[in-house]
Structures are given as structure tokens and as C-alpha cells.
Regions:
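RNA pseudouridine synthases
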Residues: 1-318
């Protein structure tokens, strides 16, 4: 555990504010929920005395924080290989392989990206979700952003909420799309199948943009940008326009084959067992320096192999 001692004087401009509100402004490196916990436990005091979170301030009081920064998560470190695209004192960019679960959960407390991060970067144990700013599904490959400090995590989470972080994907879709477009359709839990998401009335706002990169006889390679970040958003939205991702076990349906497909193409499509989706680019402003950053990731080997088969089939059919 890390010991923390901070002493601050409440500035006059915060007069009239609640203690918890002022603490969030004066100690932005800590989350509001954590500050509230410390106030309730008497670790964040006002004028040397415990106080309630709703106490109104007059200005000029002394705030004192004396506590231990306990681990935010109880996940065991594990020596799982990581591909680190970028590393500095504020953030990491990880290239996640297919099949790696991001967050521990029921049935998979080990073998996740969080376990790997905690082994290589033990200090992340003090951060919510080990610093992860967003997530990818288990069988989606590509770039993930991780904060290394609580201040960076809060800044990056706010940037994500304001849509200042640009996330770009490539996907192999079923069907032959004629052009790009934008999908604006709310996403929520499927009304009957609770493990699925769907486009539903009253769902959360969700917007996706896509453009065609390459067409094949019965499939399309698309570049996709998220404007929002709902669960399974790309998979749900592309299925909604009848262009589900190849291999998607939940939203994909049966493989679509062109007329007279080669045995190689039939085998490749029927054997592709995960959604054909890869996070290829990540663009953001550095949380401390403000520098514009952009990171790229090459398509995963299984996607490259499938594209080779699709191209060969299209060429042979000319």
C-alpha cells in the first residue's frame, strides 16, 4: 500500500461548496467515490476534525488527507505475454491478441489482460480496472488504452466521454456493401435474449460510421469508426444493416457464400470462429503533455489469411 499525506487550504472561491465537492476539485487525482469513502472514514478531515461530506465550507479551512492507497482490485498478477505498442509515465497502449479476456469475471478470474498488466506493472493495482480506459471483446483483437495514474485515467475517461479519442476498426462483413454510411440506432439489452444486445426502442444513443475499403464477391472489408462506445456496438450495428461480421457467433448468422465457391473459401469461412474485427488505430491527446498521438496495429494473422482467400476467390471469378 502507498501512504498518502496531503494538506490543503480551502480557497475563498470554494466558499459555500460541500466538502465532497471541494475535495474533488482540490484532489482531482482521486475519484469522487474514493474521496467520499475517505471522508466517511475520517481520513479526510476538515480543520483537524471529521466532517460529513455535505458540510458547507466557508473558505480558509484546512483539509488534511492521511490514508493508505489500497489496491482497487483483487486480481492476481500472472506472467502473460503482452505486446506493448507505447509506454510512458502516463499511459500504455496494448495490442491485444484474439482470445484474451480484458476484465476478470465469473468463470475467468485468471488469464485476463488485467492479470497480465498487474504482473508487468504492479502499480496499476491502485487504479480502477488496473487503469483500463475502454475494453475490447474477448475475440476482438487490436489496440487498447491503459492509464498509469489515476489523474491520467480520469482525463482519458473524460476525453472518451467527450468523443475526443478516435477509435478505428477494420471488419470483414457479410454481404457486398455498395458504399459507406452512418448508423444512428439506439442499443440496449435484447428484450428476450438477455445475453445479447440489440437495436431497441429506449436504448442508449449509439452512432457508428463505416466506409468500404475493399469488396469481394459476397463480402466487404470495411473501416469503422465509433462515435459512441456501447457494448457490442459494431457487431450489433453492422448486423442491423444486414452486414454482420464474418464469424460472429452471436450476431453473424450462417456464413454467406458466393456462387460456386472454391473449397478453400468454403473451408476458410466455415472455419472462422470469431468476429472478424480488429482495432487498427487509436488517436488521442496525451493526458499530461497535450501532444497529439496516433497508434496503429497490423491486422491479426487470421484476418490477413482470410483476406488472402477472399482476394484469390474474387480474382479467380473474374
Amino acid at each position: 500500500m502507498e501512504r498518502i499525506e496531503r494538506r490543503l487550504t480551502v480557497p475563498a472561491e470554494l466558499a459555500g461548496r460541500r466538502l465532497d465537492q471541494a475535495a474533488a476539485l482540490l484532489l482531482p487525482e482521486f475519484s469522487r467515490s474514493r474521496l467520499k469513502t475517505w471522508i466517511d472514514a475520517g481520513r479526510l478531515t476538515l480543520g483537524g476534525q471529521s466532517a460529513r461530506a455535505r458540510t458547507r465550507l466557508a473558505g480558509g479551512e484546512e483539509l488534511a488527507l492521511v490514508t493508505e492507497l489500497e489496491a482497487a482490485i483483487e486480481v492476481a498478477p500472472e506472467p502473460i505475454p503482452l505486446v506493448v505498442v507505447h509506454e510512458d509515465s502516463a499511459l500504455l497502449v496494448i495490442d491485444k491478441p484474439v482470445g484474451l479476456v480484458v476484465h476478470p469475471g465469473a468463470g475467468n478470474r485468471s488469464g485476463t489482460l488485467q492479470n497480465a498488466l498487474l504482473h508487468r506493472y504492479p502499480e496499476l493495482a491502485t487504479l480502477p480496472r488496473a487503469g483500463l480506459v475502454h475494453r475490447l471483446d474477448k475475440d476482438t483483437s487490436g489496440l487498447l488504452l491503459v492509464a498509469r495514474t489515476l489523474a491520467s485515467q480520469k482525463t482519458l475517461a473524460a476525453a472518451l466521454e467527450r468523443r475526443h479519442i478516435k477509435r478505428t476498426y477494420q471488419a470483414i462483413c457479410q454481404g457486398r456493401l455498395t458504399g459507406g454510411g452512418s448508423i444512428d440506432a439506439p442499443i440496449g439489452r435484447h428484450p428476450r435474449e438477455r445475453t445479447r444486445m440489440g437495436v431497441v426502442d429506449g436504448g442508449r444513443e449509439a452512432r457508428t460510421r463505416y466506409r468500404v475499403l475493399e469488396r469481394f464477391r459476397a463480402h466487404t472489408l470495411c473501416e469503422i469508426e465509433l462515435e459512441t462506445g456501447r457494448t457490442h456496438q459494431i457487431r450489433v450495428h453492422m448486423a442491423h444493416i444486414r452486414a454482420p461480421l464474418v464469424g460472429d457467433p452471436v450476431y453473424g448468422g450462417r456464413p454467406r457464400l458466393p456462387p460456386r465457391p472454391s473449397d478453400e473459401l468454403r473451408s476458410a469461412l466455415q472455419g472462422f470462429r470469431r468476429q472478424a474485427l480488429h482495432a487498427v488505430r487509436l488517436g488521442l491527446e496525451h493526458p499530461t503533455s497535450g501532444e497529439a498521438l496516433q497508434f496503429t496495429s497490423a491486422l491479426a494473422p487470421d484476418l490477413r489469411a482470410l483476406l488472402d482467400v477472399l482476394r484469390a476467390d474474387a480474382k479467380a471469378a473474374r
